[in-house]
Amino acid sequence: MSETQEASWLIIDGYEDEPAAFGVPPYVGFHIRYICGVLEKHNIDYDYCPIDTYRINPPSLGNRLGVVILAGAIVPGKYLRGTPISLRETREVIANTPGEIPVLCGGWAIRGWRHQGWSPLRKNLFLALQDTDATLDHFLRRNEWKHQRRTAEQWTDWAQTGAKSKAVTENPDLNGPLTYEVEVYQGCVRYKRGCKFCIEPKKGVPIWRSPEDIIREVSIAHDMGVKHVRLGGMTDTYTYMAEGVVELEYPKPNPEPIAKLLHGLRDDERLEILHTDNGNPSIIAENMEESEEITKTLVQTLSDGAVLSFGLESADPNVHEANWLNCDATQLKSAISLINKYGREKGDRGLPKLLPGLNFIAGLNGETSNTYDINLALLRELKQEGHMIRRVNIRQVEGEGFQEIDETDFQSFKKTVRDEFDGPILEEMLPVGTVLSDVWWESHEGRTRLPRHLEPKARSIEVHGKAGITFGRQIGAYPILVGMNYLAPLESYSEIIVTGHGARSITGIETGLSIDTITEKQLSAIPGISSKGAWSLVSSRAKARAKNKIFENPDDWFDASGLQVPDTIDILKIIS
């Protein structure tokens, strides 16, 4: 972040994570871009500062025209590349901002904190309960704070100006794994009787953006250097511009607009990764013909590794009814069957093209110990019938008005799912020997990226092959965590071959390592080679070099070292 010398606005991106919106790194959310787009439209200078940058090197809060804090992370999650702003940090920013400088706070976390009783006393402070961008625009025009909603015209304007704003051009991840979350629509087709725990029905009847509008915005983002895009804002990919949203319990999917959008985005050669998010199993199951056509389009246009999150939440009929959940177990199985029919085939990066993800929530009203048994019975049926599920996500309900969770039942359910399903799913989907391309390395030793991982030495080629552990992921939605038992330069790509499995992660080793430079730690990471064997290989190579000899292939090298070539993995893919 480069601070301006003259008075300017400071935009603090505290990140958003909503049921239908990602904005935690490597994602850049659309709401923060709209806020920056307002300032771009007014031609007002500003600084963009992600909260992770603020923690390391906080910019000055003085000499400001105003400060905007976006806090929108409300979905419980474990974050590896960035951490959303907390209420404590929000309070500190407000307290440290000079009293004469206006402060605007927006996002669903702000609304949640206020609902829980947070009511800070400070002049020139406003907590936006509608659209933060429109509220800021009103302030800039009228010099007064007032809750506002953006118009359709403003939506288009700020989306397009936000696409070329500092939230993109000065984003720390722009030259790396930055994924541009684009808003396709807002609201939910179940706005009348939507899931009780979810914020999306509160947004009302869906308001669509046209394919042309979205494609134009993404094209501008590509001009700024964006390569990866996720279709966000959609509670259900299959109901984009659906028919009968107001009249029908199960609106009829419309294959043409989503096909126009997806093919229009894919036609731009600058686009690399394209993913989407949610799907409503009940809509799919009750409209199989239209849903099948849309599924084919998704498989044709999305990058492999795409996941459709299915929010079953609970297979217990009593919980389903008490919480107005969006599908039952029968509808879920029909939807999973359809996605599996077309999406299981693997793509260029080594992953299945499109698979369903399954969400469960604990603590919903009506839940009993038997609820967990019903959930497990459904999972076992799906497994027995041969359905492939990309991930099973289990979380606890947030908010008021729900019941206490039996911790023993919850932990038992969670452990059983991890043992019986998560691990076996990974082993079936990515058996040992599978090659995955474009794994982006993010951290050393631990899974979470820390400030020290941003230092030049962590990114230096000098660390390659040294002792340690490296973690990384492919770019895209819900990526699988990859661990490697030696160091690799961070913020770089590798192709890897799978060597083992955890409950929700895999271990691997890079392909194409040179026979002349592969290190002892890299050799030890190959299944079938012990630490002693690795030292024998390194020693025999050193002796050969002393005699001005080189090994032409792994067979000769292993023979000279008195070792057998491992037969559990293709050694020629690893050593060349």
What does each model-identified segment do?
Residues R114-P120, E290-T295, L364-K383:
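Catalytic cores of alpha/beta
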Residues R418-G512:
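Terminal RNA-binding accessory module
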Residues S530-S531, Q564:
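Small-residue hinge/turn detector
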